[in-house]
């Protein structure tokens, strides 16, 4: 809650994936059975859904969005509530923040692609932190946010800065 998942979906995913299925197995299964594309927005990545989707022949892609601090998420949710959004408790926002990263480091074993975004900076947009393909690190940001470093440990190494060759004499 408050990391920007819905905002990201509305801005970037709604057109290619117009069907946003709730994170409920009984509502997802018909899509899997009929091999229809869909997106799921949830606080925690459902690795069982990824396994079922892969078994059904799907290519799976997880887009994970977080921020540096649960208090930032709380602030965003409070603003949203002041504008008529769904009322939630501060403790549930903090709990969902903690819960969201619990299995994230394992997700790359289940998803064909995992894109990790940081949405900490106000009005600067979603920043790609890491892109993993088939469990292998494809690219990382030059600066890894602390929250991502805690989740992935040494798995994420900042992209190497290559010096430009100097001019000969």
Whereabouts are the PLM-identified features?
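Conserved substrate/cofactor phosphate-moiety recognition/catalytic segment
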Residues: 3-38
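Glycine-rich nucleotide phosphate-binding loop and flanking beta-alpha elements
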Residues: 4, 46, 122-123
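A short linear boundary/processing microfeature
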Residues: 14-15, 68-69, 79-83
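Glycine-rich phosphate-binding loop used to anchor ATP phosphates in small-molecule kinases
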Residues: 24-68, 100, 115
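Short gly/pro/ser/thr-enriched loop/turn and capping motifs at secondary-structure boundaries
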Residues: 68-72, 95
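Conserved SF2 helicase motif VI
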Residues: 74-77
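Conserved GTP-binding G-domain of TRAFAC-class P-loop NTPases and closely related GTPase folds
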Residues: 79-168
